[in-house]
């Protein structure tokens, strides 16, 4: 798929290429082997919560309409998650029809310069592919991202990620990428609050011991 994965220790899991094989036809139109660094450094932050709280919030797309105004303005009711199967899951957010209301979303839609190798559906959608247990690839019409979490200790998690640009990026696509990253940054700040609430709820009298991120 264009990324290099290194196995540091032998284990029973199949290799990543095998795990992601079912997405090969859909993903090859993004030409991931031709991606270039965006110029932004890898980002990393420490989250004061158990890593499963972080993953639980990211896995559950049903909160998008209430918690993520930007994504809801972009997708409307067109966002859905597919269940985890054989170590991977897929989510797709198709851009909604009609006029957008938020500044970043409205301008993103109006100037979006999508990668020309994409079909019409993927020129108008954000695609996410998750790899169990802790990594997500985000495939956008204007760029590609990844992010992942690493548990440090109970109540402390490191989250890191990076963004990439398409080789043919011009000024308009670069501006599109800036706006999609702006939408993502706002979404990440909103997720921080959800993660905090999820972590704090585990210490409340109402917590019944449900297993997170099952």
Question: PLM features: residue spans?
Answer:
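C-terminal catalytic domain of Rieske-type non-heme iron oxygenases
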Residues: 2-214
């Amino acid at each position: 798929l264009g990324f290099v994965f290194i196995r540091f220790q032998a284990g029973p899991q199949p290799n990543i290429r095998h795990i992601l094989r079912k997405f090969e036809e859909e993903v090859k139109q993004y030409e991931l082997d031709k991606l270039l660094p965006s110029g932004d450094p890898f980002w990393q932050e420490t989250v004061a919560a158990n890593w499963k709280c972080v993953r639980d919030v990211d896995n559950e797309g049903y909160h998008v309409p209430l918690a993520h105004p930007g994504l809801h303005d972009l997708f409307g009711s067109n966002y859905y998650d597919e269940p985890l199967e054989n170590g991977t899951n897929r989510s797709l957010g198709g851009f909604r029809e009609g006029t957008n209301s938020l500044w970043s979303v409205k301008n993103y839609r109006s100037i979006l310069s999508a990668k020309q190798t994409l079909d019409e559906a993927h020129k108008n959608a954000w695609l996410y592919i998750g790899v169990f247990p802790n990594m997500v690839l985000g495939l956008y019409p204007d760029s590609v991202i990844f992010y992942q979490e690493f548990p440090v200790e109970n109540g402390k998690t490191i989250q890191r990620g990076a963004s990439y640009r398409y080789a043919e990026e011009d000024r308009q696509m670069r501006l599109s990428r800036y706006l999609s990253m702006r939408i993502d940054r706002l979404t990440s700040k909103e997720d921080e609050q959800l993660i905090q609430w999820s972590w704090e709820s585990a210490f409340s009298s109402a917590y019944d011991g449900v297993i997170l991120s099952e």
